[in-house]
């Protein structure tokens, strides 16, 4: 793909952010399309046939997500849908569908299964693009060390 767009709104936004964070370490051109970044359609304005949209939608399905997927599909992008059921609205629109259960035991959405699926995807893609991923993390480790991004106190890690 020329560019990878990752879309998740409302509670699915945290999932999209997680996937975008790691895909940015693996791929050159990743766009996290989300409410925090501005208007959805403006962020996806240039999506086209050489691009992929990974759309994440769980109950209660966001209309804005579905409308953005419709737009991307009209522009010829390949749609990968991550949702909870083959009967979910996103499943009917996607070229490829990955399923993960989402339970709503209370007013809080349980995103444990979707997060596990995304973790597996990130690891699998990272292994497939092992050389690029290794180079990226070697560069990042140098930057993190030079700019003290992470705590270096070893006592923190050895505490009981």
Residues of each region from the PLM?
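Glycine-rich phosphate-binding loops that contact phosphosugars or nucleotide phosphates
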Residues: 2-116, 122-127
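A short, charged, Gly/Pro-tolerant segment at domain boundaries
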Residues: 131-160
């Amino acid at each position: 793909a020329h560019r990878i767009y990752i879309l998740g709104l409302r509670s699915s936004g945290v999932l999209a952010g997680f996937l975008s964070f790691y895909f940015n370490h693996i791929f050159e051109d990743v766009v996290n399309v989300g409410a925090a970044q501005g208007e959805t359609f403006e962020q996806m304005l240039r999506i086209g046939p050489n691009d992929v949209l990974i759309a994440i939608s769980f109950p209660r399905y966001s209309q804005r997500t579905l409308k953005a997927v419709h737009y991307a599909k009209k522009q010829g992008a390949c749609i990968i849908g991550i949702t909870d059921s083959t009967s979910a609205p996103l499943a009917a629109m996607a070229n490829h569908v990955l399923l993960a259960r989402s339970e709503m035991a209370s007013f809080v959405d349980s995103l444990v299964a979707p997060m596990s699926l995304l973790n597996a995807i990130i690891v699998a893609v990272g292994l497939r693009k092992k050389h690029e991923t290794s180079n990226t993390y070697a560069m990042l480790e140098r930057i993190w060390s030079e700019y003290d991004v992470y705590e270096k106190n070893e006592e923190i890690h050895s505490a009981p």
